[in-house]
Amino acid sequence: MSAEHDQIRAVAWTGAGVRLLDQRRLPQEEIYWTIACVSDVAQAITKMVVRGAPAIGIAAAYGVVLAARARFSEAGSGWKQLLEADLCDLEAARPTAINLAWALARMQAIIQGLPDHRDPESALLVEARCIHEEDIAANRRMGELGTTLIEGSVGVLTHCNTGSLATGGFGTALGVIRHAYGKGRIEKVFADETRPWLQGARLTTWELLRDGIPVVLIADSVAPYLLGQGEVQWVIVGADRIAANGDTANKIGSYGLAVAARYHNVRFMVVAPTSTIDWNLSDGTRIPIEQRPPEEVLTLGGKAIATVGAEAYNPAFDVIPAHLIDAIVTERGVVRQPTHERMKALFG
């Protein structure tokens, strides 16, 4: 895969802090913030300055570095006790994305092995950078594996944003699209707008065009009609949490796409690193679903679009039943027609 289709990094460590591309401002403005305080990292996650399950985990890992730096400076050998509250704040920032808890668990393992009197920053920074670099490597591997499932030159539909903006780099579902496009396996990419935050319209179109990949934007409600027209052979999405049986939580609207894809005999691919799998959950009914503020539905661009007094229901995610998924692609391999037994067979 040539570098020309992978130019964006939404999360980076600068030494002074964690550098985040403010995804709320795209595509109108490209603004980067350097954040030096762990509470501001947690707020950036909650307010969706940074979003996408892998990117959230990476940002949180760097947030732990900032917290440890501050707590050791403040309390010396008592830094671990003060750090506990910071870790709790980070984990509570977004409840559905399991990558957040996974990254924090890795950082906590390093913390537990450090002596109280030692400055923890360098050891924690090494681990945070490993999490970041491993994510990029996993995404590139998933891009290769996902491409092997795509035959000929096809049309694909993707949902939300699952590229470099949502990860450490390259992307999950968009990583497959990037790699397959570079190999001549994809003729046309459709992206749906993804209400209410419009990640498809604002972020996916920006990212693909920035990296030289043509894209066609559709309204969310167009997707089932499009799938019935024969122009799309694969729907390719990411994931925020995958249960042990393959049930997959992803951005709201994914379940409806899976239903429409099955009805029209269009194949459905989920692309996510193994850190997204929650082996403690037997199925998707136990996945916690984040409820976002009603204002996100009742307003658009800061202006009211609904009559005063109307209420709004705003779950951020829904769950795709495993039987509607043709393949789950991870960096460790592909699970076709996922079940608990097939998931366990691949991952042991």
Curated annotation (Swiss-Prot):
Q: Which residues does this entry assign to the site Transition state stabilizer?
A: 160
Q: What is this protein called?
A: Methylthioribose-1-phosphate isomerase
The family line of this record is: Belongs to the eIF-2B alpha/beta/delta subunits family. MtnA subfamily.
- Single GO MF annotation: S-methyl-5-thioribose-1-phosphate isomerase activity
| The species this protein was found in | Nitrosococcus oceani (strain ATCC 19707 / BCRC 17464 / JCM 30415 / NCIMB 11848 / C-107)
Which reactions appear under catalytic activity for this entry? 5-(methylsulfanyl)-alpha-D-ribose 1-phosphate = 5-(methylsulfanyl)-D-ribulose 1-phosphate
Going by the entry's taxonomy, the superkingdom of the source organism is recorded as Bacteria
Sorted alphabetically, the keyword list is: Amino-acid biosynthesis, Isomerase, Methionine biosynthesis
Pathway listed: Amino-acid biosynthesis; L-methionine biosynthesis via salvage pathway; L-methionine from S-methyl-5-thio-alpha-D-ribose 1-phosphate: step 1/6
InterPro entries per record = IF-2B-related, IF-M1Pi, IF_2B-like_C, Initiation_fac_2B_a/b/d, M1Pi_N, NagB/RpiA_transferase-like
Give the GO biological process terms: L-methionine salvage from methylthioadenosine
Catalytic residues of the enzyme:
240 (proton donor)
The EC number on file is 5.3.1.23
Q: Describe its function.
A: Catalyzes the interconversion of methylthioribose-1-phosphate (MTR-1-P) into methylthioribulose-1-phosphate (MTRu-1-P).
What PANTHER family does this protein map onto? METHYLTHIORIBOSE-1-PHOSPHATE ISOMERASE (PTHR43475:SF1)
Please tell me where substrate binds in this chain.
51-53, 94, 199, 250-251
Q: Which Pfam families match?
A: IF-2B
